[in-house]
């Protein structure tokens, strides 16, 4: 029986694809070597321990119908569209070795006519007239008896959209001498005009087979039929939930302030697991009572725009004469936390 397994997803749903990845990783025999190929429609994928409100422009994402997906590996936030090819290599220990999977991807690129090399811990770069440019980034996850390496290859991604949805870490950029995320990446189509997702998948597959000296039939994973994977429904429900994608953010504090015609407002929130654990409201309004009441209502509230609006508008019952102020406050809060 072959120790290789090849899976290809025809879904563009990031929650579906990450749920498939998680299920395969959890139930695969430790003797198996797996290659999973996939891609996502417009999505910001964040690392397991990242704060989406800090890393992403969540308001712009909502306006543009861009999804947020939290992966189970570490690392930073990335933007995916259909111009990215995603790959995941899995293996049991002690065989799991990310240098092997990296070499498979490099061999695939070489077969396509692209000379690339590994750079740092996570990137693959190509040399251009403007200097080294990143074409691939990766992240990793290990458990006691297995590990995986997953990453993306930029084929013809809309690089102008990176800045729309990601808030770059200025300290990180300064430490690396980088002026912007956009300036240091390039698409493979700049080197191979017309290259397609299917061609890249075929090249990676052939390099995978060549390395292990075996061939297997591909298993096509489709959203039209629930994958025959243990606990898939539960894993997908978790992967697509607000509690996982937003609620798993590390504890953080958020200060919001605004000046209205009726006074200035400062909101101080402490947030843990997506819930407000402490809310303080400061104002120079001539009638601070509704804002003082709001602070109490927000304690324990989900840190989600619709929930904040709901709590604010509930005060209209007790403070009908402040309807204008409360509706202005509600709309501002909802926009500020998206």
UniProtKB/Swiss-Prot annotation:
It is found in: Cytoplasm. Disulfide bonds: none annotated. Pathway: Protein modification; protein lipoylation via exogenous pathway; protein N(6)-(lipoyl)lysine from lipoate: step 1/2; Protein modification; protein lipoylation via exogenous pathway; protein N(6)-(lipoyl)lysine from lipoate: step 2/2. ATP binds at residues 71, 76-79, 134. It comes from the Bacteria. PROSITE patterns: BPL_LPL_CATALYTIC (PS51733). PANTHER family: LIPOATE-PROTEIN LIGASE, LIPOYLTRANSFERASE 1, MITOCHONDRIAL. Monomer. This is Lipoate-protein ligase A. It comes from Escherichia coli O6:K15:H31 (strain 536 / UPEC). The lineage of its organism: Bacteria, Pseudomonadati, Pseudomonadota, Gammaproteobacteria, Enterobacterales. The gene is lplA.
């Amino acid at each position: 029986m072959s120790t290789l397994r090849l899976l290809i997803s025809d879904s563009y749903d990031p929650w579906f694809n990450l749920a498939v990845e998680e299920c395969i990783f959890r139930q695969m025999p430790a003797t198996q070597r797996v290659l999973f190929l996939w891609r996502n429609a417009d999505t910001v994928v964040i690392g397991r321990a990242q704060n989406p409100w800090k890393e992403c422009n969540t308001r712009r994402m909502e306006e543009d119908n861009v999804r947020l997906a939290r992966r189970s590996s570490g690392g930073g936030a990335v933007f995916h569209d259909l111009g990215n090819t995603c790959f995941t290599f899995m293996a049991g220990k002690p065989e799991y070795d990310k240098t092997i999977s990296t070499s498979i991807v490099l061999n695939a690129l070489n077969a396509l006519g692209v000379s690339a090399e590994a750079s740092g811990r996570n990137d693959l770069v190509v040399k251009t007239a403007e200097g080294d440019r990143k074409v691939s980034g990766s992240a990793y996850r290990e458990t006691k008896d297995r590990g995986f390496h997953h990453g993306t290859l930029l084929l013809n991604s809309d690089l102008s959209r990176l800045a729309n949805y990601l808030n770059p870490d200025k300290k990180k950029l300064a430490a690396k001498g980088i002026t912007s995320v956009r300036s240091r990446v390039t698409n493979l189509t700049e080197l191979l005009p017309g290259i397609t997702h299917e061609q890249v998948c075929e090249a990676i597959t052939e390099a995978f087979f060549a390395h292990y000296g075996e061939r297997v039939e591909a298993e096509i994973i489709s959203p039209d039929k629930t994958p025959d994977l243990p606990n898939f429904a539960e894993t997908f429900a978790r992967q697509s939930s607000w509690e996982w994608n937003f609620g798993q953010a590390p504890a953080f504090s958020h200060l919001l302030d605004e000046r209205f015609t009726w006074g200035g407002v400062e909101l101080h929130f402490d947030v843990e697991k997506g819930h407000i654990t402490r809310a303080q409201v400061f104002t120079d309004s001539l009638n601070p009572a509704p804002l003082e009441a709001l602070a109490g209502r927000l304690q324990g509230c989900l840190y989600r725009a619709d929930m904040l609006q709901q709590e604010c508008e509930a005060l209209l019952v007790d403070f009908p004469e402040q309807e204008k102020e409360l509706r202005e406050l509600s709309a501002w809060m909802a926009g500020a936390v998206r």
